[in-house]
């Protein structure tokens, strides 16, 4: 049988009053990514031809934050219920395609669960995603006959027997475009809230003798939404623990999974060790035998084999060669490239610069817009003065150069191979090969010096 085309509808128009935020609810993040972006990504993974994003509150913010997303923006000017929301997208539905309804504030739904749901959809019927809850209070109960779903009964309308049912509605469903359009047109708002509910489609399908089947989510957290920051934090921690568990099973040693955050993707080699309170953002690649100390932040970096990153170092958009040592308290800013066996120590900042093989920048140093050759030693307190208040200039240092402590290199300037720069020197002109340069004033000794006396 030919597989039907698929489109997705994502409900994301709610304000999220209980977040106490100017940001629309679905833009609050899980693992550094807006909740609704997680759902959009899943819809793409399912192979959705069209993704209809229903938006309302904070529309300008939604469009700004999701400007690069390939979605059909569908405005719901008034929030009049879930069926009303889907109805806004109905004119775009093709009769013979499947439509899956998802929720922008339920970010942990998985591709596998949705594939099972789509596979289970009966011809001209509905497949409904349900879940069993130990405490189903407040949720619509699933009423079955001969295995099929015949109704969803809300808490306030349920009798004593129905209240004992543990299976509840999640709101996620699949049907074909023609059926959705037919049933949505018949949904009324004769209820206390005066809203149009998607759950009414179950009764309408049964009236038309169309089958409604339920597929149960195996993990309740897949369908949990976040209406406040407490629930958001719970989803965040669940998701992070899930990611940490996967990495542990792949051989990554995470010392404490409860104190690890992955806010992007991590590609890793063997025998990687990650200490507590490490944050990984964007796309990070770690080689074999990499050790990351406590409190480090890595964002969009490539780290070679046998690298040690000591505690509280921050690396962003950088490349580190094998057997390098970084930190503690080092900062690699965008464009930093360290070759193999380099050392970058405490309170060193490197930006848009290359450091050659075996070179050391160990203490209290700023290196910006620079090229440092191999086997150099850059002393404590060295500054590359790369900015004149309007433009940036380069410092180029050759191989086997020794730069003494408290040296300023005023760019643009070049230091040739083998040069030695004495401590306390200010370099304003190019330095030749194997030269020694010292610019500090001669030391004076004044005998019998009397310190000033404090006036009373």
UniProtKB/Swiss-Prot annotation:
Protein location: Cytoplasm
Region (N-acetyltransferase): 251-456
Catalytic activity: alpha-D-glucosamine 1-phosphate + acetyl-CoA = N-acetyl-alpha-D-glucosamine 1-phosphate + CoA + H(+); N-acetyl-alpha-D-glucosamine 1-phosphate + UTP + H(+) = UDP-N-acetyl-alpha-D-glucosamine + diphosphate
Annotated residues for binding of Mg(2+): 105, 227
Signal peptide: none
Enzyme class, broadest EC rank: transferase
UniProt family annotation: In the N-terminal section; belongs to the N-acetylglucosamine-1-phosphate uridyltransferase family. In the C-terminal section; belongs to the transferase hexapeptide repeat family.
PANTHER family: BIFUNCTIONAL PROTEIN GLMU, NUCLEOTIDYL TRANSFERASE
Subunit structure: Homotrimer.
Designated name of the protein: Bifunctional protein GlmU
Organism in which the protein naturally occurs: Haemophilus influenzae (strain 86-028NP)
Gene: glmU
């Amino acid at each position: 049988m030919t597989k039907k085309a698929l489109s997705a509808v994502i409900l994301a128009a709610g304000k999220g009053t209980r977040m106490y935020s100017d940001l629309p609810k679905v833009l609050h993040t899980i693992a550094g990514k807006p909740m609704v972006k997680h759902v959009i990504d899943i819809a793409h993974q399912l192979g959705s031809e069209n993704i209809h994003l229903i938006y309302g509150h904070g529309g300008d913010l939604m469009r700004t934050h999701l400007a690069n997303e390939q979605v059909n923006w569908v405005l719901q000017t008034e929030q009049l219920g879930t069926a009303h929301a889907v109805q806004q997208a109905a004119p775009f539905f093709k009769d013979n395609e499947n439509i899956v309804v998802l929720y922008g504030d339920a970010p942990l739904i998985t591709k596998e669960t949705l594939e099972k749901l789509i596979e289970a959809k009966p011809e001209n019927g509905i497949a409904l995603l349900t879940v069993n809850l130990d405490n189903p209070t407040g949720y619509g109960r699933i009423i079955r006959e001969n295995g099929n779903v015949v109704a969803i009964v809300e808490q306030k309308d349920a009798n004593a027997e129905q209240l004992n049912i543990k299976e509840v509605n999640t709101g996620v469903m699949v049907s074909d475009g023609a059926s959705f359009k037919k049933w949505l047109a018949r949904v009324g708002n004769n209820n206390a809230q005066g809203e149009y509910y998607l759950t009414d489609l179950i009764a309408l399908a049964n009236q038309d003798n169309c089958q409604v089947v339920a597929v149960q989510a195996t993990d309740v957290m897949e369908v949990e939404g976040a209406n406040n920051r407490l629930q958001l934090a719970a989803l965040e921690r669940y998701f992070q623990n899930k990611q940490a568990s996967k990495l542990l099973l792949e051989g990554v040693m995470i010392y404490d999974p409860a104190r690890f955050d992955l806010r992007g993707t991590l590609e890793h080699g063997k025998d990687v060790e990650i200490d507590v309170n490490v944050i990984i953002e964007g796309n990070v690649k770690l080689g074999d035998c990499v050790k990351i100390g406590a409190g480090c932040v890595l964002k969009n970096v490539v780290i070679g084999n046998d690298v040690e990153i000591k505690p509280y170092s921050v690396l962003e958009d950088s490349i580190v060669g094998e057997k390098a040592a970084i930190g503690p308290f080092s900062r690699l800013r965008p464009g930093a490239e360290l070759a193999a066996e380099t050392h970058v120590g405490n309170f060193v900042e490197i930006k848009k610069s290359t450091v050659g093989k075996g070179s050391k920048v160990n203490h209290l140093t700023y290196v910006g817009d620079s090229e440092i050759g191999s086997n150099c030693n850059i002393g404590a307190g060295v500054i590359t003065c790369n900015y004149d208040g309007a433009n940036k200039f380069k410092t180029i240092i050759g191989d086997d150069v020794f730069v003494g402590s408290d040296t300023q290199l005023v760019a643009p300037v070049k230091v040739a191979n083998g040069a030695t720069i004495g401590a306390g020197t200010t370099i304003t002109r190019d330095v030749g090969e194997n030269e020694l340069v010292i610019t500090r004033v001669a030391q004076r000794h004044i005998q019998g010096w009397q310190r000033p006396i404090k006036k009373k």
